[in-house]
């Protein structure tokens, strides 16, 4: 937990509510017990939502550890909202259990929590790299979750904004978990299906709460659906043949040993050239990029991660991942020995994937490299032992017209819309 200036807890019992009565208290997270409450919030919010995929608790907790590289150039403060069990009616069985949370085997985990039920959470953060890049005192909020009571959301937003204002920020942007390289975006359309791997999901009432609290749209992003249960357009294969004839070679990403490290260095160089000017993006060092790549190494499937080379230099890639949310949903946020067995068993059911990025250097696009990569990436999914039925291409900013044109011309259709919000700090 990141320390913050001493402050009293905030109460929101006098705020107007369209939902319930009861006292809401905002607490700055500073203890291990409060961190546990912070981590429990999603399980309460999404208890009755069939589309929610529980994140690994360990992966969330790790982001607040004292050795997080983010702390070298940023700072943050976690907040939780707590209240009595009447405020979680309709979200979980907590109210029926008289405010006691239980483990999977029904044993009481924490007693006498009638006034300490976690109702929501938020993290306010200051990313100095973002401030330096944009030349403005822009703070961030992220990790936001809350039950369907507007008072809870309002109190959490107030706490985050007050903390950011005390840090000298004049504007807030989010949801962004420390940076856009991490989890970000709020789902505003497309609530009828689960999220793909490493994509956000939230209740449909979040956008309404944001707007009621005075937040406005900063930018939208889209997720495209691309069906694979039909023949691919002939243009894809033709583009692949043209690229090969022009001297471009293609291969799967190396995923082992020194070859993996070397490929990741090439990927970093391409990312830096192609995406460094993306809106709200912040620079990453090579070591930060390699650390993230190593954490994902065991998840990479070379069948859906083709790279393009010209005269020995990597000039493009298609970054695909199997939709690991399918087995992760069965793990329920716990990767213990039983969770690992469940993950490996249900991994065999994966029949779809997500395309995180398509990249080719501009000077090689006339060699049909982008379409050739699409062809190889899609065919890699189609030829799996359990053929992929579809792919999601996400996320693409609304004003990234070159990428949108390429995806839409290839048959992709927008099926989910996400949003980043902003608010001025008066």
Which residues fall in each region the model found?
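TRNA-binding/sensing appendages of the translation machinery
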Residues: 22-61, 161
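Alpha-helical subdomain
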Residues: 126-129, 329-330, 358, 405-408, ...
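Short, basic, low-complexity termini and linkers enriched in Ser/Thr/Gly/Pro
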Residues: 2-19, 84-117
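Glycine-rich, histidine-containing beta strand-loop boundary motifs that form or position
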Residues: 122-126, 143, 173-178, 219-221
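A conserved beta-strand-loop-helix scaffold within acyl/acetyltransferase catalytic domains
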Residues: 42-79, 83, 124-132, 255-259, ...
């Amino acid at each position: 937990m990141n320390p913050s200036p001493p402050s009293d807890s905030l109460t929101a019992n006098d705020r107007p509510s369209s939902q319930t009565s009861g006292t809401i208290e905002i607490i700055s997270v500073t203890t291990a017990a409060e961190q546990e409450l912070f981590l429990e919030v999603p399980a309460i919010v999404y208890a009755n939502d069939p589309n929610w995929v529980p994140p690994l608790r360990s992966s969330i907790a790790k982001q607040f550890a004292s050795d997080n590289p983010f702390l070298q150039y940023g700072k943050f403060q976690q907040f939780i909202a707590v209240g009595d069990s009447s405020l979680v009616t309709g979200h979980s069985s907590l109210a029926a259990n008289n405010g006691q949370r239980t483990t999977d085997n029904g044993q009481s985990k924490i007693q006498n929590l009638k006034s300490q039920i976690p109702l929501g959470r938020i993290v306010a953060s200051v990313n100095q790299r973002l401030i330096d890049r944009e030349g403005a005192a822009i703070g961030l909020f992220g990790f936001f979750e809350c039950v369907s009571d507007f008072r809870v959301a309002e109190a959490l937003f107030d706490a985050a904004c007050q903390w950011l204002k005390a840090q000298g920020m004049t504007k807030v942007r989010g949801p962004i978990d420390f940076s856009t390289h991490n989890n970000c975006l709020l789902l505003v359309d497309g609530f009828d299906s689960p999220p793909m791997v490493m994509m956000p999901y939230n209740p449909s009432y979040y956008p309404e709460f944001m707007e009621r609290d005075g937040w406005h749209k900063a930018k939208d992003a889209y997720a495209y659906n691309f069906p694979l249960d039909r023949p691919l357009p002939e243009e894809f294969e033709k583009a692949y043949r043209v690229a090969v004839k022009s001297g471009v070679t293609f291969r799967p990403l190396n995923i082992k040993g020194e070859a993996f490290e070397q490929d990741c260095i090439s990927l970093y160089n391409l990312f830096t050239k192609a995406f460094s000017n993306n809106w709200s993006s912040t620079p990453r060092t090579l070591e930060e990029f390699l650390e993230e790549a190593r954490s994902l190494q065991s998840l990479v499937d070379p069948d859906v991660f083709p790279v393009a080379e010209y005269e020995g230099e990597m000039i493009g890639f298609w970054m695909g991942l199997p939709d690991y949310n399918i087995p992760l949903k069965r793990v329920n946020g716990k990767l213990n020995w039983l969770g690992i067995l469940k993950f490996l068993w249900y991994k065999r059911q994966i029949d779809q994937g997500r395309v995180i990025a398509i990249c080719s250097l501009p000077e090689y696009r006339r060699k049909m490299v982008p379409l050739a990569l699409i062809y190889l990436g899609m065919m890699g999914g189609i030829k799996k032992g359990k053929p992929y039925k579809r792919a999601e291409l996400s996320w693409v900013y609304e004003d990234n017209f070159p990428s949108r044109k390429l995806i839409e011309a290839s048959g992709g259709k927008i099926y989910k819309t996400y949003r980043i919000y902003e608010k001025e700090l008066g």
